[in-house]
Structure formats: C-alpha cells, structure tokens
Amino acid sequence: MSQKVFISEDDEYLFGQGTHYDIYDKLGAHPSEEKGKKGFFFAVWAPNAADVHVVGDFNGWDENAHQMKRSKTGNIWTLFIPGVAIGALYKFLITAQDGRKLYKADPYANYAELRPGNASRTTDLSGFKWSDSKWYESLKGKDMNRQPIAIYECHIGSWMKHPDGTEDGFYTYRQFADRIVEYLKEMKYTHIELIGIAEHPFDGSWGYQVTGYYAPTARYGEPTDFMYLINQLHKHGIGVILDWVPAHFCPDEFGLACFDGTCIYEDPDPRKGEHPDWGTKIFNLAKPEVKNFLIANALYWIRKFHIDGLRVDAVASMLYLDYGKKDGQWVPNKYGDNKNLDAIEFFKHFNSVVRGTYPNILTIAEESTAWPKVTAPPEEDGLGFAFKWNMGWMHDFCEYMKLDPYFRQGAHYMMTFAMSYNDSENYILPLSHDEVVHLKCSMVEKMPGYKVDKYANLRVGYTYMFGHSGKKLLFMGQDFGQEREWSEKRELDWFLLENDLNRGMKDYVGKLLEIYRKYPALYEVDNDWGGFEWINADDKERSTYSFYRRASNGKDNILFVLNMTPMERKGFKVGVPFDGTYTKILDSAKECYGGSGSSVPDKIKAVKGLCDYKDYSIEFDLPPYGAEVFVFQTKKTKN
C-alpha cells in the first residue's frame, strides 16, 4: 500500500543546508496515496520559476491540467496527481520569470524514456526483492586496502551484441547478468566497473554527459532490471563500481541547464559555469542544493541499487579553476590562485558522508595531476578518497611498452619511477577505455614487433602490472587481446578467441588474476615499501627487471623476473633474499599461452653467493620477452 509522500519544513531546511541525504525520496516522482486515492507525488526544485505544471501522457500533455503548488520557502513545487500509473511519461513545464516555457525532464527521476525521447517516466523502486545479504556479510570488518581488487571495466552496450538483428542489439540488464557473471567468475575478477549507466542522450558520450543522474539508462531495461544485475553479481561474489560524473553535465535544453529559466545548477558566469573543451556545464558547488543533489545521488546508488563503489570522473577538472581553459576563460579564487575551493570542500564533504556511513564503499578518484593527499582523510586535510587512479604509472607503462626493445634501455626508468611515489596514495593501476580509443590503439596493437611479438610483449607487460604495487583495472577486451580500438557501436571481437594467441592471452590473464587473488603478498601491503622490494631495478643494458612482493606473515613471497627484449638471457642469475627452493607459478613463454616454449625449471634451489646485493641467487635461461614468477618462503632463523 502506498504511503503519503510530502515535503516538510524540515525537508526544505535540510535541503537548503545541503545535508538532506535522502532528498531523492522526496523530490522527483513517487508513488503516493491521498484521501484513499493512489497516484504519484511530484516535487521539483525550481526557486526562480514563475509557475510550474506537470505534463504527461496521463493528461495529454495539457499545459494547464496540473498546476503545481509553491512551498512556503518558494523554492520547491509540489503536486499529488491521482490515477497516474507506473510507467507514465512526464515532464515539468516551467514558466520562467520572463515568460519562456521550458519543458524539463525531472532531475530526480528514477527512470527515463529511451532515447531519442527525453521525457521522464514514473516507476516504483520498492518492488525488487534483494537476496545479496551474504555479500554484505563477507565484507564486514574488512580493510579494503588489504584486499585483492581486480576491476573489469565494462560498457554493457558494446560488450556483446544480441544476435536478434535489432538496430541497437543491446542485451537487457537481465540478459547481460547471466553472461557477465559467468565471464567474471571464469576470469576471477573481483569487481566490475560499469560505464554509461546514468541516463544520457548521446551514445557517443559513453555516458559522460548525463541528463538523468538518478535514472539507470533505459537502453537496457527498467531500474529493477538493473537491480537484478547487481543482485546476481553480488550473489556470485563480485562487487559493482559505477562511473560517476559530478564534474559537469549535459547542456541539452531538456536537462539541468538553465533549469527554471535561470542557472540554478550551474554558475551563470560562463567562465565558471562552462567547460569549453567538452561543451558541457559545470556544477555550481558553492550552492548547498547542488552539493546536496550530488552527494544524495551517490548515496542513492549505494542505498537503492547496492552499488559498492563510485569511480569519480575528471576530478582534476573540478580541482583546478583553469583546467582546460585559457587566460580570460576562468576566474581565480579569493586568494588569487587556481584552486577550486568549493570543489575541495565538496570532495571532503562527499567522502566524509559516503565513507563515514559506509566504510567499505570504494570512492575512486580519476585524478591526473600530482594533487596531494587525494586518499588521505579529510581530518588530515586530504580529499578522503579510498583510492586514486595512478595515471602517472599508466602513462609511463604505455609509453615504455610501445617502444622498440632496442630503445627500451634508454627509457628503463619509466618502469621503476612509479614506485618512488607509490606510498603517497592508495593507488589503482588503470588500463582503461581511455587508452584504447582516439587512435591510441588497443593494448596489444600498442606493442612493437610482429604479431607473435606483440602478444609476448603484452604478456610480460601485464605480469609487471600484476606484480607492481596497487590494485588493478583492465578494460573489457584487453584481457584476450582485442586488436581493434574500442567503439561503443560494436561488440568486442569475440571471434578472435578462435585463435591460439587470443585464447592464450585470455588464459594467461586468467592465471594472473588467479595468482593475484591467491597470494596475499600481491595485495596486502600495496602502499608502502613493506610489501615490495627491488632485486634489480637498474639492469637497463639488458632491459630486465626483478623484484619481489613480501607477504606480511613471511609465507608465500612472490618473485618476479621480467625480460623486456626478444633476446634470450642464457644463464640469467638473479639475487634472492633467502635460501630455499623457488617454485615457479607462472611462465609467460609456455606454449599454452602463445609462447615459444620455456626451459625454466619448475623448482630452483637457491645458491649461496652475493648477487644483486643479496646473499643468495637462482639461475636459469630467461626466455625472450619472458615473465617468470616464483613463490618462496621466508627462511626462519633460530633464536
């Protein structure tokens, strides 16, 4: 039975303060009942409107049928309309102070019309029955910094197309659920990061120009279908991260821009309210109601849809007032510099509320500069994020791996530099969609050499990534050697898995993921030197790297030896920290992975003798583009 929904004076007060964190239960369109009649309660923030009406298919889009009432503060307009059913299309018809009539989609709508339509649609989120309690039980008491996190970044509409021949070829959320769960479990990813979920009008924006912040896109079904997808992922032990875009919004006239005839979501000064590079509007974070809109939105996805994390897009564009702008296109802050004080306060507020309420929620910053303390807590003057994408590592990795092996010795430092600042933040190593578009080539096509060399290069490169400190992220298709760049218009080239090299690559990444999750040395201590030690970081003449990851309990330490050239290194000697047997757990040169074969023994006994400043060493023939991974135990000493 529907309950009566209404806006109280307390609601208005808290919203005006920017602290009404469940305002999404009041603003928007909600099933309600008044005087025994069922219908929908509509509410919209439009403080400068002269008048507001609700128009929809239930009243023939009649401009005069349903006039809303202004609240006591004058900022919010409300109306209960009996008889409105679930699934009805509607908009707010706002009359501006100058007489203009603006047809606006509901900023707080939970569901929207499928593009090219842009109306909002009524729905009821309360009907879905969740069954993911075991997932939440499994998270209790866990420090996510000390857990394995391996993220599969995915765009639903282009992951796989339906063979039914329809124009879009989209699988529904429910159809996608069954397929993606099977894939993620097979590969052993811990999380999926979904891009393009919040409603957006243009497919080519990939979901980064949003019009419906509270509406899962209708491209793949209804909101309850999206709930089903998350529920299924949780039931199989897979976390869900959502791409979230608080930096800017779509300028389309039916959306948030100039919403009530004035700029209530953006700053009216284009130097503050517009992003020239992207052609988008910038949220005015000085306004409490705008901050409330965004922070409540984050909580909405967590509470209503059981989202486990938010990857926050374009953080740098928010922190710097002059980001992507020329002189004269931006306004300094009150101190005369380029720091966006409102954005800094917003991130501290956002993370304090979200992570203070839900400690295991992953808030992840895509921050591309050296802004300090992104993952430090707000009480230490940090922004409070759980993790930050390590864009510096990503850049150096891609630039190095693209080089002809002959020139790699001159860029040897590019693969070691990231460890020099690794302890400054809690990092995720991202190889995301941004690296495989706009003529940047897919990951495998970035690699030098003939086809077999490209795959060998990528195998050793990925091994370096999984051995390096930091959580992991791979974009879809890059785990099996997708050769074309990503396009939102087509599915991944799954047919490539008919080829030995691609099957080998998929199996190899699957093995990397298995090893990563199995051995705590690879994830327990990611952000200080206690978990990582170079054996030899300076062998630039041969372009080899050796290091080991140290387990906190002294057991199952992992040694990595990498050869970044096509030259076999006969009798390769590497220093090791302890006596004992080193057991091989991964060999990139194996034929089953697409390699040419390897003679590296499964077990190698350490020999006493100084090497690489270590008291012991092991010796073997290091294959061309070889990645050799060993597990070993700390030798116990008697007291």
Swiss-Prot record:
Record-linked Pfam families: Alpha-amylase, Alpha-amylase_C, CBM_48
UniProt keywords, alphabetically: Carbohydrate metabolism, Glycogen biosynthesis, Glycogen metabolism, Glycosyltransferase, Transferase
Pathway assigned to this chain's UniProt record: Glycan biosynthesis; glycogen biosynthesis
Enzyme class, UniProt record, top EC level: transferase
List of catalytic residues: 313 (nucleophile), 366 (proton donor)
Record GO cellular component, one term: cytosol
Single Gene Ontology BP annotation: glycogen biosynthetic process
Reaction(s) catalysed by this chain's protein: Transfers a segment of a (1->4)-alpha-D-glucan chain to a primary hydroxy group in a similar glucan chain
InterPro entries to which the protein is assigned, alphabetical: A-amylase/branching_C, Branching_enzy, GlgB, GlgB_N_E_set_prok, Glyco_hydro_13_cat_dom, Glyco_hydro_13_N, Glyco_hydro_b, Glycoside_hydrolase_SF
Enzyme Commission number, as recorded: 2.4.1.18
A GO MF label: 1,4-alpha-glucan branching enzyme activity
Annotated Gene3D superfamilies: Glycosidases, Golgi alpha-mannosidase II, Immunoglobulins
Function, in words: Catalyzes the formation of the alpha-1,6-glucosidic linkages in glycogen by scission of a 1,4-alpha-linked oligosaccharide from growing alpha-1,4-glucan chains and the subsequent attachment of the oligosaccharide to the alpha-1,6 position.
Record-linked NCBIfam families: branching_enzym, PRK05402.1, PRK12313.1
Subunit-level organization: Monomer.
Protein name: 1,4-alpha-glucan branching enzyme GlgB
Natural source organism: Butyrivibrio fibrisolvens
This protein's encoding gene: glgB
